[in-house]
C-alpha cells in the first residue's frame, strides 16, 4: 500500500487540468495504483462538475477553497479495489520500451539516468528517469528548485523515510538527502526538476558547474 501521496492541493490542480504534462503523468502513474487518491480525484471531479453547472460565473472564495481542501482531507474515502490486468501504464506507452531495456547512462556512485525531456517539447522542466542499483547510494545533494518524483520500481530510503513503488514525493531547496536503494531490486524513479540538483559532498560538489 502506498504511504506517500500527492497532497489535496496537487490533486485539485490535476482535477482542474492546471498541471504541466510531465507532472500530470506522475499523478496518473500514482492514481493507476492508488485507489485512495483515485477516489479523492473522483470526488474532486464530481464537485467541480456541480460547481460549473450551478454557479458558472461565481468565483471560489478563499474560505470556500479551504473548506473544499478540508473536506477532501477529512472525509472518509472508501477505496475502490485495484483492478488486475491493466493495460500498459502511460509511461510505457510514451517510451515504447520496458524500463529494463532503456539506454541508461551511468553517472556518479551507483546511479544511472535517462533524460526523457524530449518527449515533452513544450515544457521547460527537465524530465528524467533515475536508477539506483539494489543497495546502491546516490550522491548527497539538495535542489535548486522543485523536484517531483514517483517511484516506478523497487524502493529507496533517505532521511525522510522509505519510499516504495508508486510512492510520490516533492522536494525543494530546503531538502538535503542521500537516497539509498533498498536491497532486492534496482530502484527506478521518474523525476521532474525545475532546476538542476546541487551536489553537497566534499568532493562531488566540485562537479556542480558541469551539471545541467
Indicate residue ranges for each PLM-predicted region.
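Glycine- and acidic-residue-biased ligand/ion/polar-headgroup-sensing regions
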Residues: 133-136, 142-158
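Short Cys/His-rich Zn2+-coordinating modules
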Residues: 12-22
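Short beta-strand His + acidic residue motifs that chelate non-heme Fe in jelly-roll/DSBH
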Residues: 41, 138-141, 159, 177-183
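Positively biased amphipathic helices and basic secretion/translocation or surface-docking motifs
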Residues: 1-9, 22, 32-35, 43-100
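A short glycine-rich, His/Asp/Glu-containing loop-to-beta-strand
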Residues: 102-134, 139
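Ligand-binding loop in jelly-roll beta-barrel domains
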Residues: 175-199
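Short acidic-glycine-tyrosine-enriched beta hairpin
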Residues: 158-178
Amino acid at each position: 500500500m502506498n504511504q506517500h501521496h500527492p497532497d489535496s492541493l496537487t490533486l485539485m490542480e490535476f482535477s482542474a487540468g492546471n498541471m504541466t504534462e510531465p507532472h500530470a503523468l506522475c499523478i496518473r502513474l500514482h492514481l493507476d495504483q492508488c485507489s485512495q487518491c483515485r477516489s479523492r480525484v473522483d470526488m474532486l471531479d464530481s464537485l467541480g462538475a456541480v460547481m460549473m453547472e450551478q454557479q458558472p460565473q461565481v468565483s471560489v472564495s478563499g474560505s470556500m477553497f479551504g473548506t473544499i481542501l478540508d473536506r477532501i482531507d477529512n472525509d472518509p474515502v472508501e477505496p475502490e479495489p485495484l483492478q488486475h490486468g491493466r493495460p500498459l501504464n502511460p509511461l510505457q506507452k510514451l517510451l515504447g520500451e520496458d524500463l529494463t531495456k532503456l539506454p541508461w547512462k551511468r553517472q556518479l556512485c551507483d546511479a544511472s539516468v535517462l533524460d526523457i525531456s524530449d518527449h515533452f517539447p513544450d515544457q521547460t522542466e527537465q524530465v528524467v528517469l533515475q536508477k539506483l542499483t539494489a543497495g546502491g547510494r546516490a550522491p548527497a545533494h539538495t535542489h535548486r528548485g522543485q523536484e517531483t518524483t514517483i517511484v516506478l520500481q523497487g524502493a529507496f530510503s533517505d532521511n525522510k523515510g522509505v519510499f516504495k513503488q508508486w510512492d510520490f514525493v516533492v522536494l525543494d531547496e530546503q531538502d538535503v538527502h542521500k537516497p539509498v536503494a533498498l536491497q532486492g531490486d534496482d530502484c527506478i524513479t521518474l523525476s521532474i526538476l525545475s532546476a538542476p540538483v546541487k551536489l553537497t559532498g566534499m568532493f562531488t560538489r566540485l562537479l556542480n558547474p558541469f551539471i545541467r
